[in-house]
């Protein structure tokens, strides 16, 4: 049996993201984000679903194991480190990510947490900037939404 969740991004950068996970295993994120500047944009799960102060109140990257920032394929990374999405010349990014660390169940579930799309490219912790090992030097927060259980 699969578990499904959804996240709706609103504002000038908007979209719908669908999450699907089989009972045990990787979680797949699919969807589309529009209104972006063409190029790569950091794409992360943040620790809180609190959007009372816009994306700022969503906290830092979801990092229950207290690791440094990294790429999705790295063994050492934040759970919420999903790398980058790439917007085409029309400003639309098609999302199709399968990740082994995010989960829709259990103690470290991402349900109720926020997805954040960033202004710049995530350097995956390898850029040598002061904030590379914490945020991937991905810049400001363009859009966010809370991940919720899908009734379908």
From Swiss-Prot:
Positions bound to Cu cation: 44, 46, 61, 118
Keywords: Acetylation, Antioxidant, Copper, Cytoplasm, Disulfide bond, Metal-binding, Oxidoreductase, Zinc
Known cofactor(s): Cu cation; Zn(2+)
Disulfide bond sites: 55-144
Coiled coil feature spans: none
TM region positions: none
Stored PROSITE patterns: SOD_CU_ZN_1, SOD_CU_ZN_2
CDD domains in alphabetical order: Cu-Zn_Superoxide_Dismutase (cd00305)
Annotated Zn(2+) binding sites: 61, 69, 78, 81
One Gene Ontology term of the molecular function aspect: superoxide dismutase activity
EC number: 1.15.1.1
Subcellular location: Cytoplasm
Modified residues (N-acetylserine): 2
Entries under InterPro entries matching the protein: SOD-like_Cu/Zn_dom_sf, SOD_Cu/Zn_/chaperone, SOD_Cu/Zn_BS, SOD_Cu_Zn_dom
GO cellular component, one term: cytoplasm
Activation and inhibition: Inhibited by KCN and diethyldithiocarbamate.
Keyword Oxidoreductase: yes
Family: Belongs to the Cu-Zn superoxide dismutase family.
Physiological role: Destroys radicals which are normally produced within the cells and which are toxic to biological systems. The plasma superoxide dismutase has phagocytosis-stimulating activity and may play an important role in the biological defenses of the organism.
Quaternary structure note: Monomer.
The name this protein goes by in its record: Superoxide dismutase [Cu-Zn]
Organism: Halocynthia roretzi (Sea squirt)
Lineage, broadest ranks: Eukaryota, Metazoa, Chordata, Tunicata, Ascidiacea
């Amino acid at each position: 049996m699969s578990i499904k969740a959804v996240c709706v991004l609103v504002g000038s950068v908007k979209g719908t993201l669908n999450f699907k996970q089989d009972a045990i295993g990787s979680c797949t994120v699919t969807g589309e984000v529009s209104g972006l500047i063409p190029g790569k944009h950091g794409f992360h799960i943040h620790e809180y679903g609190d959007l009372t102060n816009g994306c700022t109140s969503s906290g830092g990257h979801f990092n229950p194991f207290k690791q440094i920032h990294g790429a999705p394929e790295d063994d050492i990374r934040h759970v919420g480190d999903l790398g980058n999405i790439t917007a085409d010349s029309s400003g639309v990014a098609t999302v199709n990510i399968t990740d082994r660390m995010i989960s829709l169940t259990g103690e470290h579930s991402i349900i109720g947490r926020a997805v954040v799309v960033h202004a710049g490219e995530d350097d995956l912790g390898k850029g040598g900037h002061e904030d590379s090992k914490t945020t991937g030097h991905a810049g400001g927060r363009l859009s966010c939404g809370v991940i919720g259980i899908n009734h379908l």
